Swiss-Prot record:
The keyword Ribosomal protein applies. Keywords: Chloroplast, Plastid, Ribonucleoprotein, Ribosomal protein, RNA-binding, rRNA-binding. It comes from Pyropia yezoensis. This is Large ribosomal subunit protein uL11c. Its main location: plastid. Signal peptide: none annotated. NCBIfam families: L11_bact. Part of the ribosomal stalk of the 50S ribosomal subunit. Interacts with L10 and the large rRNA to form the base of the stalk. L10 forms an elongated spine to which L12 dimers bind in a sequential fashion forming a multimeric L10(L12)X complex. The gene is rpl11. One of its GO terms (biological process) is translation. Forms part of the ribosomal stalk which helps the ribosome interact with GTP-bound translation factors. One of its GO terms (cellular component) is chloroplast. It is found in: Plastid, Chloroplast. It holds the Pfam family Ribosomal_L11_N. Belongs to the universal ribosomal protein uL11 family.
Amino acid sequence: MAKKVTGIVKLALNAGKATPAPPVGPALGQHGVNIVMFCKEYNARTADKSGLVIPVEISIYEDRSFTFILKTPPASVLIAKAAGLNKGSGEPNTKKVGSITNKQLESIAETKLPDLNTNNIPQAMKIVGGTAKNMGILIKD
């Protein structure tokens, strides 16, 4: 018989840098999960992706055990990294703060494909392109 899930916690943490301090500690502590064990496992699985924010979905079971699924980094983080920026524009319609090429857009779309609502690259590129536009980043050919 499968274990019964008692809670699902979603967090976005820096890769390889999870610590028992907030937000991890309070989010998992209220479910009675071994926080240090989660931090060690998360850091081990994300060590190769340092510098990125990696969302994680943690399923917590009745016996206080847990499993977690790593998601792809947010499109905005990947776009900002490709454009060499820390953050997007505060006024994306009037102030353009950077640009990325179609090639960079395609590689970001391929990275994000498992977490998007589509299976084809051109549609994924449109989704990621919309995020870039909302960040005030131009897409060049």
